[in-house]
Amino acid sequence: MRKFWLLFAQATTIGLAVLFIINTLKPGLLSSATRNGIVTLHESVNTSTSQIPTAGFSAAARKVMPAVVNIFTSTEIKKPMNPFMDDPRFRFFFGEEFDSSPQRGSNLGSGVIISHDGYILTNHHVIEAADQIEVALADGRKAKGRIIGSDPESDLAVIKIDLPGTIPAITFSRPDQAQVGDIVLAIGNPFGVGQTVTMGIVSAVKRNHLGLNTFENFIQTDAAINPGNSGGALVDVNGNLIGINSAIYSPNGGSLGIGFAIPVSTAKKIMEQIIQSGSVTRGWVGVAVQEITPELAESFKLGNIQGVLISEVVRGSPADKAGVHAGDILTMVDNKQLLTDSSSMLETISSLSPGKVVVFKLLRNQREVGIQVQVGKRPRPKKLE
């Protein structure tokens, strides 16, 4: 009996050893039925782990850098007159320390050459109030820039330079080509140190409600963007323009990996209007709207109806003349369903041509009303003094 148990123990030991070796070296030989409770994972058969160019991004950078410029602006700053400067005795004791003669302030930014005849796209805030503009190209050439026009509500502007010889120009990507996760390069002149290329990814698209501009549809990126990068290029790995770097989120002024660029689809529309007429024309009806919250929907007994609540009507505006009232629910414009946010309403109305007559479909006192509204021209924003 003792011999039997000895043989059994030896056989069991050998069997377990064989199973251990097979499971270690050839786990696929074991039937999945012997591993109850273990989830089978499917590994990718694709051997390619990245679409990053084997030579890095130097080709894309070389393609783009000649078309990205440094912009230096200066503005005359008038100091308030000191009331004591007219007194000779005051000037005798204090000299010209309180001189109120004009001084000059300077600013810097970046821009993108969009055509071989010298048109440059940049941010409105880069050239705002500038009375002198100098543009420095990557090849060392410099030229005076003149403002063709600007659009404060999208923070875009176009300037022009005149130079002998060839002027490089950037290539545009197809509109709305950028996708979350795409690798991008940002090119500009951060802090005035000179042309700089940084790399990151597209973190998000269609960012709005940031309070930066009236019209917002930003590409968000973690590519380093710093003061001086404004107006520079955001490009894909092929060196095609996908956006104009415009702003960063930063409590201390440095890059925290949250930058915003105006997409090329928006930039092209604004740019073309500015080049043609020197300004941007948008539709306007004179209403303020707010989004309909679940509480408002219940209060107005809207059910599944989508739209925006008209909270204010400007007196004398096209909407006022047509009979639109505060408290109306706007659901459609010319039979086009509105999204449920104020940004979509703003985009819809601003895209209409002034003078066009459109039909507003309204819900008033739980009854559907159709009103014809003649679209007006959106007023330019007032400058802050």
Annotate each predicted stretch with a short phrase.
Residues 327:
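Conserved catalytic motifs of ABC-family nucleotide-binding domains
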Residues 330:
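Short alpha-helical segments in extracytoplasmic peptidoglycan/chitin-binding modules
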Residues 2-306, 311-315, 322, 333-336, ...:
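Serine-dependent protease modules
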